[in-house]
């Protein structure tokens, strides 16, 4: 009988995390969704109430789940500045992985999802195409801290890691304003109500610029592949 894989999904209430959780459930996984309330999780998943910023709380919440085989991390904690984002976002990843590592000897893969800021788009124009081998841009950037921590922590661990790097992401999530599709939909609705044509609201430069968008379902498929693919170990992969 084939072993049923068990995932702990951090950030499952967001667009990316939801896309991953839906894909895993469809593939027959047992999926635990970590959130502060432990509720509001997707059909077919189980809620785990935990504050990811609290290391002791993470350890207590994960302790009953000794069979976790994979961690999927797409959680994000906003902060007033790039520098201020580093500590909480690194802490959430570290707290989750260390808690699972302690509770579950079955852990074998950590799949981190970062994003296009890995290539410095927040600072202006970036190279096209972006490649995983591109040099890092000006720090601070919590994506770099997260990947560096995984690389170092995995050296003496049984588990391996993967960093998935998508561009702009579209998809569905409840109560999440970080959604390009939602913004376009609201703009279109306002234009319709006012009887205005749906014109591009930005500059000529923005209109003519090359952009890529990944659907959350595509990221979910990539995460499911990265979970067990022999080629997906200890490196980053663009998802476009």
Go through the PLM ranges and name each one:
Residues 10, 202-209, 235-240:
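Glycine-rich Rossmann NAD(P)(H)-binding loop
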Residues 39-95, 101:
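NAD(P)H-binding glycine-rich loop region in Rossmannoid oxidoreductase-like domains
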Residues 157-221:
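NAD(P)-dependent short-chain dehydrogenase/reductase
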Residues 2-27:
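N-terminal Rossmann NAD(P)H-binding glycine-rich loop of SDR-like oxidoreductase domains
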Residues 219-240:
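Mid/C-terminal beta-alpha module of Rossmann-like enzyme folds, strongest
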Residues 71-73, 83-84, 91-142, 162:
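Conserved Rossmann-fold NAD(P)-dependent oxidoreductase catalytic core, especially the SDR/UDP-sugar
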Residues 136-167, 172:
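Active-site Tyr-X1-5-Lys
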Residues 28-40:
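Conserved glycine-rich Rossmann-like NAD(P)H-binding loop of the short-chain dehydrogenase/reductase
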């Amino acid at each position: 009988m084939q072993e049923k894989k068990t995932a702990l999904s951090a950030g499952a209430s967001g667009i990316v995390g939801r896309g991953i959780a839906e894909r895993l459930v469809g593939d027959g996984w047992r999926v635990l969704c970590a959130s502060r309330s432990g509720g509001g999780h997707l059909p077919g998943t189980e809620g785990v109430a935990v504050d990811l910023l609290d290391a002791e709380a993470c350890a207590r919440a994960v302790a009953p789940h000794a069979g976790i085989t994979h961690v999927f991390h797409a959680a994000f904690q906003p902060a007033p500045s790039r520098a201020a984002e580093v500590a909480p976002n690194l802490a959430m990843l570290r707290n989750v992985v260390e808690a699972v590592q302690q509770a579950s000897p079955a852990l074998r893969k950590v799949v981190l999802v970062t994003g296009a800021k890995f290539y410095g788009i927040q600072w202006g124009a970036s190279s096209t195409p972006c490649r995983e081998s591109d040099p890092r841009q000006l720090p601070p950037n919590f994506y770099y801290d997260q990947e560096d921590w995984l690389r170092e922590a995995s050296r003496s661990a049984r588990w391996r890691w993967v960093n998935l790097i998508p561009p702009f992401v579209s998809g569905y999530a409840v109560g999440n304003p970080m959604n390009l599709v939602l913004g376009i939909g609201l703009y279109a609705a306002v234009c319709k109500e006012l009887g205005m044509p749906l014109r591009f609201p930005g500059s000529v430069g923005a209109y003519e610029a090359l952009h890529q968008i990944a659907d959350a379902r595509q990221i979910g498929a990539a995460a499911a592949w990265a979970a067990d693919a022999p080629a997906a170990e200890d490196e980053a992969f663009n998802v476009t």
